[in-house]
Amino acid sequence: MKRKILSIAFGLVVVPSAIMAQTAATEHTIRANEAVKTELDFNDRQDFEDASRGFIATVNTSAIMTEDGKESYSLEGWDFLKNDVPETANPSLWRQSQLNRFNGLFEVIPDKLYQVRGFDIANMTFIRSDHGWIIIDVTTTNAAAKAGYDLIKKHVADLPVEGVIFTHPHGDHYGGIAAIREGSSKKDFEIIAPKGFMASAQNENVLAGVAMTRRATYMYGLQLEPSVTGNLGCGLGQAMSTGSKGIARPTIEIETTGEKHTIDGVEMEFVYVLDRKSVV
């Protein structure tokens, strides 16, 4: 009996991936999408100027690859977004995905603050310290984190990591930590995170792992291929990178708002927002 139940459960998981491909937009969908065009000012291109501002460089490959040669994150897979919005897509989501498609290394504040975007659903932010880099969030996987760190070392400065900040315990903010440590000449840098970080990461990814995975399947459209009738992106970003990932125990835990720490000459003041983005 158990074997039959498992087979049925497996079928319920697999079958949707075979029937997810969509056909042409219905008349209702076309009318709804056309209505959006009248509600928003699509002639305003300021966001595109903002998204491209400070661009330095990106990788010269069609995808971010893992160490064993597998695709971690496709870059050219979203090239269909270069075209005008089709009838099958909500114009606002299409535009947002076009903005999210910008990828590579960007200068935010000259000689002080840089970001790597579009290699994962999460960004990596690099703060220039006295002797190296302080990194805010390290993406979901080692492949994406390595690509980002390599990019700033190549185009700005090849410096060690002096500190890493995990803003909260969702995997896209800490998963690439091993690649950062491996790529840095300094291995014993500080890792700053909210109080209760490890317990929360365990609760969400182990104890609630099955439910979180199910939610992510809907949330990220994991069974849809990128296309005009499939996955257009997640809104927040295009997609999560795939491949090996890890976690590291924080060396400093933030417990109160206003708490200050100085890392390699950079004083940082933290805001503790319990139970907001995640458990901590």
Regions found by a protein language model. Give the residues of each.
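Bacterial N-terminal signal peptides that target proteins for export
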Residues: M1-A9
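Bacterial N-terminal signal peptides
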Residues: A9-S17
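N-terminal pre-domain segments of enzymes
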Residues: Q22-F102
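Non-globular, low-confidence helical/coil segments that flank catalytic cores
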Residues: V36, L40, D47, A51-I56, ...
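Short, acidic/polar N-cap/turn motifs at the starts of alpha helices
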Residues: N60-S62, N103-G104, M124, T251, ...
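Conserved beta-strand hairpin/beta-sheet module of binuclear metal-dependent hydrolase folds
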Residues: Q98-L159, S278-V280
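Metallo-beta-lactamase
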Residues: E107-V108, A157, I192, F197-L274
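Active-site metal-binding motif and surrounding structural segment of the metallo-beta-lactamase
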Residues: H131-G132, N142-I192
